[in-house]
């Protein structure tokens, strides 16, 4: 490797790191030293890092009693933490310091995404500068920013490019062993994403066969097959218990059938898929364009900052014989047909598009290729992007039926009636129109950038494009993170929960129920809990809850009518933030839990004791 090329590798890593610091630092400063978001990030990522750190250091890495009513430690946490190399970087630090490491680790993940995407893309482009642009687009893509909510998804984004590089090296340069190691790494890091990567790798392999330079012999094919098996075997210590635990959960056995194999239901998912290509990412649980798509947690986001699909569409138009031309339409077809989409999650009926980061990587390469090649006119792709943005934006003005209260002036009586109004269809109007404005602005700025592409020297144009890309990545990422943080907890509220000191002078075995605070708060306090928010538990836990008459999906959150379950589960204490005692739902809970009596107040929390504790 030439010295100048090494410089670009460093640039791919450190420029993304600087941008990551610029992106996350304001949030860290506002929230008192660590990054707070909303939803699953607050309820799972920080508590799980804390619990796993403590468990490993205490030697409790076979069975976790702090997870619901008890769970296989490796099977339950391989999906979230144990396979992540970034989690293991947190192990030298005290468990209570985990919350301060979340933002630095996110920055490191983004930096690695940029580096490894650059390493992949440089194989297919002439200019290293264009590969730098592709690396940034991958690291700060809509998928990447959407899934800050699911912090552990970035690990798959980091290691996936390495497997594609290894495949290329095995076939093109006849290198051995590297593919087996990357298969092992991907399977070890996250078994869920690895299954989808296997499906994509088959599609990728078949498309690459159309390239004369990608020559496959029987020997090479057998080497790939052998190294694939060896790779999975090497990851077996993590992969096998994780798979066994996963298939033991009820949700894993639900599959598609009937018309749902062929057509998405609800039909709004089709609109959501196309919206994800041309607009900044909606955040989880906020589908503003297509609110009835039933895809609140599906990670439907494939937007590339500034360029959108302009580079991809232009590439397909002007490179008719290139292997990548076939890959993207095939991936779109998989996304549009439910049974094909579900193949990435072993045909489960839960709707997810968490495999989008794989075609996004290729889309980043196609965009980088289009930027450096004068024969590709990106204005062609921009026209189609503009058409798509205008068409999808029409959702915002479509007539919809809304309820209106009408007051009779004469009698003063109020009646509710249905009326048809414009501009009422989006779920949340302000984020909707901000997203529209950002998408339109990106098209205009991109047009200004590429209109004089032919007149500029390639290197000068790519340097200009790189600067535009950096600014765009930060702007679109800020939009997503500010939106998510705005609907998160008030500044200081989550800090009070995380840093609370709850001391119960009790040597017996007991569980603590927390109510009105973040899920899994007991993990932050080092206590056994009654409530839990965790997707992967042993099948026996689900059988137990079913026998108790409680239907559990991903959350153990029985209402007050299950007062007997609390005693059976050895729930001895109930902890509630004191200022929430006046809330109506809190009062309802306490009315049902008559066996609980107030015994103490600590650090802004009121503690109740169960007189019927077993």
Q: Which residues does each PLM region occupy?
A:
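Periplasmic/ER-lumenal interhelical loops and adjacent helix-loop junctions
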Residues: 43, 47-52, 78, 85, ...
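Membrane-interface helix-loop-helix junctions at transmembrane boundaries of multi-pass membrane enzymes
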Residues: 214-222, 311-335, 456
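Transmembrane alpha-helical segments
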Residues: 113-120, 159-171, 199-207, 308-313, ...
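Membrane-interface coil-to-helix junctions
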Residues: 19-114, 136-158, 246-251, 259-303, ...
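Soluble catalytic regions of membrane-associated enzymes that act on cell-envelope
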Residues: 91-92, 428-430, 462-614
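Membrane-embedded helix bundles of polyisoprenyl
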Residues: 16-20, 110-123, 129-210, 223-243, ...
């Amino acid at each position: 490797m030439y010295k100048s090329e090494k410089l670009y590798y460093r640039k791919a890593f450190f420029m993304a790191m600087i941008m990551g610091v610029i992106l996350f630092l304001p949030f860290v400063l506002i929230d008192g030293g660590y990054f707070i978001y909303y939803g699953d990030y607050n309820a799972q990522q920080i508590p799980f890092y804390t619990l796993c750190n403590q468990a490993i250091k205490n030697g409790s890495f076979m069975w976790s009693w702090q997870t619901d009513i008890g769970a296989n430690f490796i099977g339950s946490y391989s999906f979230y933490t144990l396979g992540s190399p970034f989690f293991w970087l947190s192990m030298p630090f005290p468990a209570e310091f985990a919350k301060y490491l979340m933002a630095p680790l996110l920055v490191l993940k983004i930096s690695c995404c940029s580096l490894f995407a650059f390493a992949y893309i440089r194989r297919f482009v002439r200019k290293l500068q264009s590969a730098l642009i592709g690396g940034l687009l991958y690291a700060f893509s809509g998928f990447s920013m959407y899934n800050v909510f699911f912090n552990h998804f970035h690990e798959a984004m980091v290691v996936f490019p390495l497997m594609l590089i290894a495949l290329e090296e095995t076939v093109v340069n006849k290198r051995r062993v590297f593919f087996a190691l990357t298969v092992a790494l991907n399977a070890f890091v996250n078994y869920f994403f690895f299954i989808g990567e296997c499906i994509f790798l088959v599609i990728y392999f078949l498309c690459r066969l159309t390239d004369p330079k990608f020559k496959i012999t029987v020997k090479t094919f057998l080497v790939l097959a052998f190294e694939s098996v060896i790779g999975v075997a090497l990851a077996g210590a993590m992969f096998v218990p994780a798979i066994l635990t996963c298939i033991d959960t009820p949700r894993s056995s639900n599959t598609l059938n009937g018309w749902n194999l062929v057509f998405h239901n609800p039909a709004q998912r089709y609109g959501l898929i196309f919206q994800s290509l041309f607009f900044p990412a909606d955040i989880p649980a906020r589908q503003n364009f297509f609110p009835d798509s039933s895809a609140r947690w599906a990670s439907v986001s494939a937007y590339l900052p500034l360029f959108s699909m302009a580079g991809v569409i232009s590439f397909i138009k002007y490179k008719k014989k290139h292997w990548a031309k076939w890959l993207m339409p095939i991936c779109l077809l998989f996304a549009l047909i439910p049974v094909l989409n579900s193949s990435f999650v072993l045909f489960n009926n839960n709707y997810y598009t968490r495999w989008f980061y794989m075609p996004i990587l290729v889309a980043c390469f196609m965009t980088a290729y289009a930027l450096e090649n004068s024969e590709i006119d990106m204005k062609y792709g921009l026209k189609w992007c503009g058409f798509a943005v205008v068409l999808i934006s029409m959702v915002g003005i479509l007539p919809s039926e809304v309820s209106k209260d009408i007051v009779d002036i004469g009698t003063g009586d109020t009646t509710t009636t249905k009326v048809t109004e414009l501009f009422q269809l989006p779920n949340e109007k302000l984020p909707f129109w901000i997203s529209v404005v950002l998408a339109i602005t990106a098209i205009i700025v991109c047009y200004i950038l590429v209109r004089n592409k032919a007149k500029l020297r390639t290197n000068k144009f790519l340097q200009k494009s790189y600067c535009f890309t950096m600014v765009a990545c930060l702007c679109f990422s800020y939009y997503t993170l500010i939106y998510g943080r705005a609907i998160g907890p008030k500044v200081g509220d989550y800090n009070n929960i995380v840093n609370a000191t709850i001391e119960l002078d009790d040597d017996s075995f007991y569980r603590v129920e927390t109510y009105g605070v973040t899920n899994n708060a007991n993990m932050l306090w080092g206590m056994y809990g009654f409530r839990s928010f965790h997707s992967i538990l042993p099948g026996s836990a689900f059988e137990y809850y079913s026998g108790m008459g409680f239907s559990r999906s991903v959350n153990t959150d029985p209402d007050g009518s299950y007062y007997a379950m609390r005693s059976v589960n050895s729930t001895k204490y109930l902890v509630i933030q004191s200022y929430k005692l006046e809330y109506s739902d809190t009062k309802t809970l306490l009315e049902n839990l008559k066996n609980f009596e107030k015994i103490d107040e600590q650090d802004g929390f009121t503690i109740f004791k169960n007189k019927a504790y077993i």
